[in-house]
Amino acid sequence: MPSSKRTAAIIVAAGRGLRAGAGGPKQYRTIGGRTVISRAMEAFCQHPDVFAVQPVLNPDDLSMFNQAAAQFRYRPPANGGATRQASVRAGLEALAADAPDIVLIHDAARPFVTPALITRAIDAADKAGAAVPAIAVTDTIKQVDESGAVNATPDRAKLRIAQTPQAFHFDMILDAHRRAAREGRDDFTDDAALAEWVGLTVATFEGDAANMKLTTPEDFVREEARLAAALGDIRTGTGYDVHAFGEGDHLMLCGVKVPHNCGFLAHSDGDVGLHALVDAILGALADGDIGSHFPPSDPQWKGAASDKFLKYAVDRVTARGGRVANLEVTMICQQPKIGPLRDQMRARIADITGVAISRIAVKATTSERLGFTGREEGIAATASATIRLPWNDKGRDT
């Protein structure tokens, strides 16, 4: 049953994440073919009980964020502070003019948050005022002194691992953050600790072991392997396209502008290589063909750049929780010569799709002067795509 409380979410994404390596903020690294922050935001942006999502960013990351979150609706990002605590306060202040009843505060570095966990967070905050998701500690914990010697063994039955989203009545947590700022306290590692400091009782609710925080390079390696293992529904598709030559001074081939003594006769830019790849991906999805998604009778696609079509097809895979594993396209033509352009074309396809260039093949052949390609009347292209989708015991993607 939908909640009657107005709920907003703050996505804390201003940190640098240097321990994760890779030379940039970890929230913009990809995992399973998608950025960490995109995965973290999706469940909140699509949750029926969350009316607003407030990102908090380092302003230097704005262009990366805009690209990663392009498919979502969210409030204008707030600028983060020098600490996580300062960043959360910035997000709370950004929401204050249209204050929600409940606010969920979530770390962007936890990309596997689920709608069910969000619902539990809202319910818990509604009942308790302040609540955190928690999971039981299964290992024995040792407390050590300055030398590293064990001096205590806490009772693990009384210990919990706190996660996010942490959920609060909005006014309560905003007041707590403002008080901490006034008193110069900026050392709280999560919002529950700050709430405890001002005297609030913080409840716990069932967390999710999969809702882990990505911190180290090893975390990324482990989660990549876990995601890959879950994508057991391996599918292939094929595509074919052909366009005749017409007037012009260049051809678009696999996203590359190739000078030539003619152009293509086509409704869009006529890129036979990308069109064949689009059909291959859609075929693997059993999701129609390029003509059903971009009908030539629709004037909005007149002269359209075909990279839009290919990006759309890849996004269809991503929307179903999958990834593109391999792409191959073969150009059939006498001219132009594809060999000198091969790596440029592979790089362009990689840029459009987000697929590693090592998983993209561009090949070429001729028809030995036979048929319309042999007479240099046009170009044909064939393509294949391999995709991986989530599998369940009924053989359907989830």
Curated annotation (Swiss-Prot):
Its EC number is 2.7.7.60, 4.6.1.12. The gene is ispDF. This is Bifunctional enzyme IspD/IspF. Bifunctional enzyme that catalyzes the formation of 4-diphosphocytidyl-2-C-methyl-D-erythritol from CTP and 2-C-methyl-D-erythritol 4-phosphate (MEP) (IspD), and catalyzes the conversion of 4-diphosphocytidyl-2-C-methyl-D-erythritol 2-phosphate (CDP-ME2P) to 2-C-methyl-D-erythritol 2,4-cyclodiphosphate (ME-CPP) with a corresponding release of cytidine 5-monophosphate (CMP) (IspF). Its cofactor is a divalent metal cation. A divalent metal cation binds at D241, H243, H275. One of its GO terms (biological process) is isopentenyl diphosphate biosynthetic process, methylerythritol 4-phosphate pathway. The keyword Transferase applies. The record marks R19, K26, H267, T366 as: Transition state stabilizer. Pathway: Isoprenoid biosynthesis; isopentenyl diphosphate biosynthesis via DXP pathway; isopentenyl diphosphate from 1-deoxy-D-xylulose 5-phosphate: step 2/6; Isoprenoid biosynthesis; isopentenyl diphosphate biosynthesis via DXP pathway; isopentenyl diphosphate from 1-deoxy-D-xylulose 5-phosphate: step 4/6. InterPro entries: IspD, IspD/F, IspD/TarI, ISPD_synthase_CS, MECDP_synthase, MECDP_synthase_CS, MECDP_synthase_sf, Nucleotide-diphossugar_trans. GO terms for molecular function: 2-C-methyl-D-erythritol 2,4-cyclodiphosphate synthase activity; 2-C-methyl-D-erythritol 4-phosphate cytidylyltransferase activity; metal ion binding. It catalyses: 2-C-methyl-D-erythritol 4-phosphate + CTP + H(+) = 4-CDP-2-C-methyl-D-erythritol + diphosphate; 4-CDP-2-C-methyl-D-erythritol 2-phosphate = 2-C-methyl-D-erythritol 2,4-cyclic diphosphate + CMP. In the N-terminal section; belongs to the IspD/TarI cytidylyltransferase family. IspD subfamily. Residues 235-398 are annotated as: 2-C-methyl-D-erythritol 2,4-cyclodiphosphate synthase. 4-CDP-2-C-methyl-D-erythritol 2-phosphate binds at D241, V242, H243, H267, S268, D289, I290, G291, T365, T366, S367, E368, F372, R375. The record marks R156, K213 as: Positions MEP for the nucleophilic attack. Residues 1-234 are annotated as: 2-C-methyl-D-erythritol 4-phosphate cytidylyltransferase. Keywords: Isoprene biosynthesis, Lyase, Metal-binding, Multifunctional enzyme, Nucleotidyltransferase, Transferase.
